[in-house]
């Protein structure tokens, strides 16, 4: 039987939209932008299951809850990718590459993939602890997800030979995901709507510029004809034609 350790007291140490199962399980599941998969994952044996809507504070909360439980050695990424934030891709990049000196996740493609409340040591502990990331991004097939969880459990290497690390995440300011111990996730539908509104705004601006150009062109053309006609009449008058 794999060796197990006690997680930090009060685990999970950061509250959120999580469903908690067996704290001795080796599997954590991130459902990204999807909901409704949690109970099936818990029934399959996961330790903790929940979404991740943002590529900064959301990921910080995952790191904090994972490294405070040495038993979690696998991370399953599933559910629909969060448009704009790309939290699944950012989590993979974090595990593969870590963070730079500025806190930016190396290779991440999300909008703002910067970790302000988690240092390199915590990130490196997370990377050491998680031995495998199972990529089921954009998969909501319960059978595939639960099968992946069971396969991870069958390969359980036991708890990492390090003590739990407790991170104290600072409360975010206005408009951030965290405010105290509560979570205010960014809806993926809103993120998609904002992206479409930006595209529409750009198209409107382009159309306005084109209309302005056309208006100036036609006005100039009319003025040119009028001036040409006036000059012609003047010349005819001078020549006595």
Curated annotation (Swiss-Prot):
Keywords associated with the record: Cell membrane, Cobalt, Membrane, Methanogenesis, Methyltransferase, One-carbon metabolism, Transferase, Translocase, Transmembrane, Transmembrane helix
Protein name in UniProt: Tetrahydromethanopterin S-methyltransferase subunit A
Cytoplasmic side: 1-220
Transmembrane segments annotated in the record for this chain: 221-241
Function: Part of a complex that catalyzes the formation of methyl-coenzyme M and tetrahydromethanopterin from coenzyme M and methyl-tetrahydromethanopterin. This is an energy-conserving, sodium-ion translocating step.
EC category name: translocase
Membrane topology, from the record: Single-pass membrane protein
Annotated catalysed reactions: 5-methyl-5,6,7,8-tetrahydromethanopterin + coenzyme M + 2 Na(+)(in) = 5,6,7,8-tetrahydromethanopterin + methyl-coenzyme M + 2 Na(+)(out)
Provenance organism: Methanocaldococcus fervens (strain DSM 4213 / JCM 15782 / AG86)
Localisation: Cell membrane
GO molecular function, one term: cobalt ion binding
Pathway per the UniProt entry: One-carbon metabolism; methanogenesis from CO(2); methyl-coenzyme M from 5,10-methylene-5,6,7,8-tetrahydromethanopterin: step 2/2
One Gene Ontology term, aspect cellular component: plasma membrane
Subunit structure of this chain's protein: The complex is composed of 8 subunits; MtrA, MtrB, MtrC, MtrD, MtrE, MtrF, MtrG and MtrH.
Cofactor(s), by name: 5-hydroxybenzimidazolylcob(I)amide
Biological process, per Gene Ontology: methanogenesis, from carbon dioxide; methylation; one-carbon metabolic process
């Amino acid at each position: 039987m794999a060796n197990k350790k006690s997680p930090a007291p009060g685990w999970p140490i950061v509250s959120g939209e999580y469903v908690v199962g067996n704290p001795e399980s080796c599997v954590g599941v991130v459902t990204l932008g999807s909901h409704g998969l949690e109970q099936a994952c818990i029934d399959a044996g996961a330790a903790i299951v929940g979404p991740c809507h943002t590529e900064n504070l959301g990921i910080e909360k995952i790191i904090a809850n994972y490294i405070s439980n040495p038993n979690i050695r696998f991370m399953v990424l599933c559910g629909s990718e969060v448009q704009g934030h790309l939290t699944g891709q950012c989590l993979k990049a974090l595990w593969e590459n870590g963070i730079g000196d500025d806190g930016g996740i190396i290779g991440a493609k999300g909008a703002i993939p910067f970790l302000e409340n988690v240092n390199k040591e915590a990130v490196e502990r997370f990377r050491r602890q998680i031995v495998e990331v199972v990529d089921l991004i954009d998969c909501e097939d319960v059978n595939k997800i639960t099968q992946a969880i069971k396969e991870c459990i069958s390969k359980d290497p036991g708890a990492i030979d390090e003590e739990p690390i407790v991170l104290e995440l600072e409360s975010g300011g206005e408009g951030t995901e965290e405010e105290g111990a509560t979570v205010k996730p960014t809806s993926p539908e809103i993120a998609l709507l904002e992206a479409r509104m930006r595209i529409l705004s750009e198209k409107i601006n382009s159309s306005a510029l084109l209309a302005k150009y056309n208006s100036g062109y036609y006005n100039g053309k009319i003025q040119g004809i009028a001036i040409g006609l006036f000059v012609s009449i003047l010349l005819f008058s001078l020549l006595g034609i």
